[in-house]
């Protein structure tokens, strides 16, 4: 019985990937140049450390543009009281500025303000200069540009390259830490 169950799970994983109607929006948590088709939506959730969860709803406005909202909740899987990261949801926006061709990759410009982990606030006072910062344990991607090229050589093979800059989550004390 265990043998047949393993075969069933293996075949289900293989064939479910073939039927995917659109390219991946993210590789785990790293953005790609995939966008949602017009009129479609996704509802995803990401489990993070300390029993946190980040639900995310994204909607395809056009074939090249989508917008999403997410909200970080800490202690979701815990006996503690729920702790919401911020009073407002975070935003994800992605616009494909160049469609993938036979020779050139697809290119997207995006914004993701959702960081991972707890939202931290620190206020230093006393002998030090007053330093105020608010940021996530793992900073949000911020503004990013990603290029993706896919091949059907060995199934579905893709190469994704990108750059990002988060300009609003800063820490004046640990400014050298990119995370």
Feature roles, as predicted:
Residues 1-2, 142:
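Intrinsically disordered, low-complexity segments enriched in small/polar residues
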Residues 3-15:
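Sec-dependent N-terminal signal peptides
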Residues 7, 154-155:
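Intrinsically disordered, low-complexity segments enriched in polar/charged small residues
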Residues 17-153, 166-167, 177:
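Transmembrane beta-barrel domains of Gram-negative outer membranes and organellar outer membranes
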Residues 158:
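Mobile, glycine-rich extracellular loop/lid and propeptide segments
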Residues 161-179:
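A mid-sequence, solvent-exposed acidic-amphipathic segment
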């Amino acid at each position: 019985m265990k043998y047949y169950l393993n075969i069933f799970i293996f075949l289900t994983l293989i064939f479910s990937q073939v039927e995917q109607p659109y390219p991946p929006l993210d590789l785990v948590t790293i953005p790609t140049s995939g966008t949602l088709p017009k009129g479609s939506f996704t509802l995803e959730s990401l489990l993070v450390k300390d029993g946190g969860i980040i639900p995310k709803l994204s909607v395809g406005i056009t074939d090249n543009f989508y917008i999403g909202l997410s909200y970080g909740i800490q202690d979701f899987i815990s006996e503690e009281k729920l702790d919401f990261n911020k009073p407002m949801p975070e935003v994800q926006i992605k616009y494909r500025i160049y469609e993938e061709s036979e020779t050139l990759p697809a290119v997207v410009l995006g914004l993701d303000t959702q960081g991972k982990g707890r939202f931290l606030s620190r206020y230093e006072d006393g002998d030090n200069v007053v330093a105020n910062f608010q940021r996530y344990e793992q900073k949000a991607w911020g503004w990013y540009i990603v290029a993706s090229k896919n091949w059907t050589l060995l199934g579905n093979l893709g190469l994704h390259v990108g750059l990002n800059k988060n300009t609003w989550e800063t820490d004046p004390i640990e400014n050298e830490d990119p995370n």
